[in-house]
């Protein structure tokens, strides 16, 4: 594994403090085993939806961390978007998430990640249900903590520059987050609308992947224990209990 990272990280053959595992099926078992073997933390790249109960328990018992490296949710601009949403001085009226994916196999994963992002930026998602589903599109509705309605739409097709969008509307303004494909060098963009006009927040030229590894440094230096698994599990449980993805 190679990356442009601070010098405090280096690749070693054995007994690594941090291990990276693929998020393909079975990743929770692989990550759990890495922690049991003494790793202080695990980075999971592109995790698929799986139960995380055992892994969360192991991480707590070992005082270890698990960081999920995801295509959209790991983008550092989500922090800016969350702060912008929290500064809105009126109740939120509506939240809209839309995303384009390249294949049918990506649809359910995009729904799962969208729920995580809504949770992180706006608030916990509830009452989620499928309104419409065809072979290449899915539309869901729900609400967030506080009662504001939420829609999530995922479509299979070409993404023009930025495949993921989150829009939060309130009587006093709005926040728009657009996240590029992780394979590009473009930054995510956060735009804030108010009575004074439109403001684009300063760009953060850091990829989701690099941001994930920067969080590894923070976990060591400050003892951070990220909420990744909690948010991931909350999305999984919500989709299992309240929305039929078949």
Label every model-predicted segment.
Residues 2-43, 56-60, 64-65, 214-246:
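C-terminal helix-rich "cap/oligomerization" subdomain common to oxidoreductases
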Residues 43-48, 66-70:
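Short beta-strand elements of ligand-binding domains
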Residues 78, 114-115, 210-217:
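A general structural signal for well-ordered alpha-helical segments in protein cores
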Residues 149-214:
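NAD(P)-dinucleotide binding in Rossmann-like oxidoreductases
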């Amino acid at each position: 594994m190679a990356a442009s990272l601070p010098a405090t990280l280096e690749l070693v053959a054995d007994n690594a403090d941090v291990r990276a595992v693929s998020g393909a099926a079975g990743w929770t078992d692989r990550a759990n085993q890495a922690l049991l073997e003494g790793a202080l933390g695990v980075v999971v790249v592109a995790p698929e939806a799986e139960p995380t109960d055992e892994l969360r328990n192991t991480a707590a018992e070992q005082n270890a961390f698990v960081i999920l490296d995801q295509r959209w949710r790991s983008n550092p601009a989500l922090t800016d978007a969350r702060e912008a949403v929290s500064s809105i001085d009126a109740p939120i009226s509506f939240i809209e998430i839309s995303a384009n994916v390249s294949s049918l196999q990506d649809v359910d994963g995009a729904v799962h990640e969208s729920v995580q992002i809504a949770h992180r930026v706006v608030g916990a998602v509830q009452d989620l249900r499928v309104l419409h589903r065809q072979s290449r599109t899915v539309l869901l509705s729900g609400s967030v903590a506080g009662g504001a309605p939420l829609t999530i739409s995922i479509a299979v097709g070409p993404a023009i520059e930025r495949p993921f969008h989150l829009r939060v509307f309130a009587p006093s303004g709005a926040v728009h987050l657009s996240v590029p494909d992780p394979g590009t060098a473009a930054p995510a963009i956060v735009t804030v609308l108010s009575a004074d006009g439109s403001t684009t927040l300063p760009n953060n030229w850091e990829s989701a992947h690099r941001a994930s590894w920067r969080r590894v440094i923070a976990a060591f230096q400050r003892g951070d224990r990220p909420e990744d698994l909690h948010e991931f599990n909350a999305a999984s449980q919500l989709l299992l209990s309240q929305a039929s993805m078949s």
